[in-house]
A protein has these predicted regions:
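C-terminal helix-rich "cap/oligomerization" subdomain common to oxidoreductases
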Residues: 1-5, 78-80, 337-340, 344-393
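N-terminal Rossmann-like dinucleotide-binding module
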Residues: 1-55
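Predominantly a Rossmann-like dinucleotide-binding segment in NAD(P)-dependent oxidoreductases
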Residues: 4, 15, 136-229, 301, ...
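Beta-loop-alpha module in the N-terminal Rossmann-like domain of NAD(P)-dependent dehydrogenases
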Residues: 56-121
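Hydrophobic residues in well-ordered beta-strands that form the structural core
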Residues: 104, 129-131, 293
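Rossmann-fold dehydrogenase core element
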Residues: 117-135, 155-158
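Intrinsic disorder/low-complexity segments
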Residues: 242-261
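C-terminal glycine/acidic-rich active-site capping loop/insertion
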Residues: 257, 282, 288-364, 393
Length: 393
């Protein structure tokens, strides 16, 4: 049976940007959609050149995203938003109001109120809204989720997640910055947070995704260590986890958490972790076993037991299909052929596009995850400003 190829447009993501090309590669991974239009940059020359490099019809390369949505809404299947933070909400809102499904970079907005409004519009118009919390797309993260769900770890007591980078150790914020870094330090563009809104939301979403639990309260200590930096570049956050509400569980494809009433989480996110590159390391401790996953060795998942040898699960090994349908479906290449970040985002796009076609719930971060992540950011900022007091999420 011939499968219809979808058509999409992109706002932001000019040639030379970091995340735009990754989105395009991820979408091409399963060859389900074609880029047919775009508004790639505020810079007119960069916008035109990007369209040319991507072999687009010049008449479908727009100087303004509002013009793009007005002219293309009836011809597109979905819109991808890869712009700076302050424009996520207005672009996503306009696209949803025009009847377009949307895949929007994180953070979904600058405030909880904005994120909730996007959620209401998507629900009212029955549209699909996806967010690239990419680490939830890794096969072994899906295996971790399913092992927890099946009770392999027992009652979950403790979760430790660190997401550490050393990138800000290379930057002097007292001097003029290149475009890629300058906007992240401007509150009018990035919003009121840097590290929490940039990579902290990834860590938060991973914890809720893997455990199936919901963070109820947090205590945050935010710091700015890099000279000249106006926003947070380091965060230490404690969280208390519990079963999600029924409505939240339904929005997470019916996933219920591991049996736990008092689970605690410790989250460390930093951009001043000297020597680190992109260290995402997850540990989940239950009363029967624990697990460990490292994003820099993403094809392996370790499980430790009190009285048995440690087990290392390998992506695409023959036994994976029996343990986790999600991990099996997310594995693309034979065992021993490593998969990474682009493939993980490709998995999320595969599920997002399936939802666009079927109008059914699929396994990707959607409206619920986007709103939850913004509640996390606002709670962390509120806690830090109040002297690191426990704050409701």
């Amino acid at each position: 049976m011939k499968v219809k190829r979808l058509q999409y447009a992109m706002v932001g993501g000019a040639k030379g940007s970091f995340i735009g090309p990754i989105h395009r590669m991820a979408i091409r991974m399963d060859d389900l959609a074609d880029l047919v239009a775009g508004c790639f940059s505020r810079d007119p020359k960069a916008n035109v050149v990007s369209g040319e490099k991507l072999s687009l019809d010049p008449t479908r390369v727009y100087s303004d995203w509002k013009k793009l949505i007005a002219a293309e809404a009836d011809r597109l299947d979905f819109l991808v938003v890869c712009t700076t933070n302050e424009t996520h909400y207005p672009i996503a809102k306009a696209a949803l109001e025009a009847g377009l499904d949307v895949f929007c970079e994180k953070p979904l907005s600058l405030t909880v109120k904005e994120a909730e409004e996007l959620g209401r519009i998507a629900k009212r118009k029955r549209l699909v809204l996806g967010i690239p919390f990419t680490y939830t797309g890794y096969p072994m993260v899906k295996l971790a989720r399913d092992l927890v769900k099946k009770g392999e770890l027992g009652k979950i007591d403790k979760v430790v997640l660190e997401y550490v980078q050393g990138s800000f150790r290379k930057i002097d914020f007292t001097k003029p910055l290149d475009k890629r870094n300058a906007w992240k330090m401007n509150p009018k563009v990035s919003g009121p947070s840097c590290v929490v809104a940039d990579i902290g939301v990834h860590a938060f979403t991973m914890i809720e995704y893997v455990t199936g639990l919901e963070a109820k309260t947090l205590l945050a200590d935010l710091s700015s260590f890099a000279p000249g930096n106006r926003l947070d570049d380091d965060a230490s956050i404690l969280m208390r986890l519990a079963e999600p509400s029924r409505s939240e569980a339904r929005e997470r494809s019916g996933t219920r958490g591991a049996t736990s009433s008092t689970a605690k989480a410790s989250l460390v996110v930093s951009k001043i972790a000297t020597g680190e590159e992109n260290g995402v390391r997850l540990r989940v401790y239950g009363d029967k076993a624990s697990l460990f996953w490292d994003q820099e060795s993403p094809n392996y998942l370790s499980v430790k037991y009190p009285l048995k040898p440690e087990m290392t699960f390998k992506r695409k090994a023959p036994y994976i299909a029996d343990l986790s349908d999600g991990a099996q479906r997310a594995s693309r290449f034979p065992a021993g052929h490593h998969e990474g970040f682009v493939e993980a985002l490709g998995n999320i796009y595969d599920e997002f596009i399936a939802a666009v076609v079927s109008r059914k719930t699929r396994d990707f971060p959607g409206v619920c995850a986007g709103i939850r992540s913004m509640r996390f950011v606002e709670a962390a900022l509120k806690s830090a400003k109040s002297g690191s007091r426990w704050t409701k999420i």
